[in-house]
Amino acid sequence: MTITLRNLLASLLILGVVACSSVGKNHPAVTTTSDFTIVPAINMQTPRSGHTATLIRDGRVLIAGGMERNGTYFNSVELYSPATGSFNFAHSMSARRVGHTATLLQNGKVLIAGGFDGSGSLDSAEVYDPATDSFTPTGNMNSRRGDFTATLLRSGKVLVVGGEASSALASAEVYDPGTGKFSRTGDMTSGRTMHTATLLPSGKVLITGGGDYQKPLATAELYDPATGSFSATGSMAIARYKHAAELLPDGNALILGGSDGRDWRGQYVSAEIYDTAKHTFRLAGNMSVARFKITEAVARLKTGEILIAGGGERCEVYDNRTGSFKLVNGQMDTARFYSTATLLADGQVLIAGGYDTHGVASSKAWVFKT
């Protein structure tokens, strides 16, 4: 989950001035597909943005933490049941968290780590057990982090990368579920926050963009679990942060949207593809609207297409077979930022929360249907 508390609070002050010029600019070349539609769902119990949403093994979705516009930070947790289409409160976390991460472990439990609690970044972590609906503290990270990434490796361990404390961090660490401890691993070549991390078929992890506050990078690097080290791997066409990345069926990675560091004034409509064989990036066409703050609002469908569900009123899908974007039937009430999109067991997608162009968090949810 990537959301910088400092950046979020500052940007809320200027949303009303710039949002109309930066959000919802349509590009007619994008067509509409009748294969998919989006419909309203029952609301969450609490308005949230910057929360996490994790599909657990029994098919429910764990919604954890987040915040409201007024600076209310949550330790509360909800569970969405596809069987009933409803949200119900679960046991709360031990700490209030926004900009944290949630990772489904191989044992079916969920690792919640870091984030911001309103007074600064956190190093604490806890594990949620769906069988008992309870959180248990686990070892602390070696560094306080918010706006970082956490990636489940093939070994079952979790790679934690970058993020922000007082500045962007280059450090990384690995969580071992067997010991419940975090251990340091090699550093990145650059400090990064608001970046993306994508597990590739090779087992390596692709890190793209991010950077320090309002200073995004175009560079990318690969983490090799075998050596515990990072190495540079090409550069994107443009510097991006607050963007999204998703693995494509062919093993390449799709990089979507983001901003040039000016936030609302600098949103991108463009996309790029990382070629895992050539270690290079190439442009991949434009979305229907410029979108940013969408890191958790992207999901790969069972068809292999990529759903982009944040940053605009309309959802769209990217078809790797044709290399094109298509709008989805139906729309949300407004563009939403720092929302979540979670692929459900039946192939539908739960879209939840986020804040609007006035910075107001929502409890509304939608279901993307195939």
Residue ranges and their predicted role:
Residues 1-9:
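Bacterial N-terminal signal peptides that target proteins for export
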Residues 10-18:
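Bacterial N-terminal signal peptides
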Residues 21-370:
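Kelch-like beta-propeller repeat domains
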